[in-house]
């Protein structure tokens, strides 16, 4: 069954200077943002009141991506961030008092330095050895025994620049695969990579700035599909959103689920609680400044 999604526009202004990543704490929701600072906003008892800004770090410049999860397998969540301007990938352990500003350097761990044109972050135990890896752009970073050392790096697709990254089990064998889209190219590739040699399988090589990427089961058949969406940037007059429907044998059916609405950094979640993954996106460099929801109506 092909995925069927209904577009619902939400028109609203947005703050052009920040990107936000959301994380949940017991009873409250906080969010960490990028720019010259990485910070989290503490939710008050009444969430309609102003939230308190708490700086995590101001040591680097231009934080494109953030990720929150247990990256060092100690049972605690950490904050991972990549600084394009400073070309570093680091993570922060949460100090006993997370309201201290900025978080002390003693809680920072450096994963990699001298990284160029890297975008996109994900984490997963790729080789089932019980140790989490970080996928940063087209690179896999493996954690060293010595926590003070830089992580090992394996580049799986060096020609892919400024990518979006998604990780999930596509083959159905229980092992995660990696999906990359070249989010800042006008003739961009979308490809998935299979372990252990990370062979590339290109699904499309003519996309326009596919700066949205996710893995989810959109058609409810128990197989993970791949979503990507194109930007507009004032030159692409017919941007498209695609779901690549997983046929279960290593092949995919391309399904265009939307045309004419550009999107940037769209996310996948069940918005209306019906058990189906929906899509939420917003524009980039578009003066109309709109947020859009595509409700998944597959099977309805």
Predicted regions and their residues:
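Beta-propeller-forming repeat regions
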Residues: 1-300
